[in-house]
Amino acid sequence: MPHFVGMVSRLRDRILTGPGGVERPLTREEMLAWAAEVDLDAVDLSCHCEFSDDAYARNGVLKNDHFELVVICWKAGQVSPIHDHGESNCLYLVTGGTMTEEIYRRGDQPERAALVESREWGRGDVTIADGPTIHRVCNHSSEDLVTIHLYSPPLPDPPNTYSAEEAAGS
């Protein structure tokens, strides 16, 4: 646990408010640099890992005007809604399990989206979804999934959600 507390402290203090820190949302490069410092073998997320039988569980760690850090716990079969992040970038760090990210494009009707691609991310993988990216995060495996999400600026509440539309020719 000390490593995770230190990781959060570095994000808050050094990157955002410490000497030479920034008082603005993080850039993609700053988010990736922070994630590169994470040693998954030393991270103990147990105090931030609560699962739910009903839906994936968002466990807030730290939030201010410039970023939001969340540990999300997914049981087998749990999925997020199809959504975008508004003006936020979202860095995902998979700490355990396999995350499936389904990428969508805007549909022919407002609030509709069509699946165009599916990607799998495993332990230690890092990816960023920028604001306009429409996607869904899924745990299609039979194992639990734990992901760290760094949103900058914080995720809008509520996020923009979409309904799936049938792919052409189906």
Question: At which residue positions do the language-model features occur?
Answer:
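Asparagine-centered strand-capping/turn motif at beta-strand->loop junctions
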Residues: 137-141
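Conserved short histidine dyad/triad with adjacent acidic residue
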Residues: 70-85, 130-132
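Short acidic-glycine-tyrosine-enriched beta hairpin
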Residues: 91, 106-134
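N-terminal leader/capping segments at the start of a protein or of a new domain
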Residues: 1-41
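A short glycine-rich, His/Asp/Glu-containing loop-to-beta-strand
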Residues: 47-78
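Domain-scale activation on soluble regions of proteins
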Residues: 118, 150, 157-170
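A short hydrophobic beta-strand segment most commonly corresponding to one strand
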Residues: 91, 142-158
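Glycine- and acidic-residue-biased ligand/ion/polar-headgroup-sensing regions
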Residues: 76, 87-107
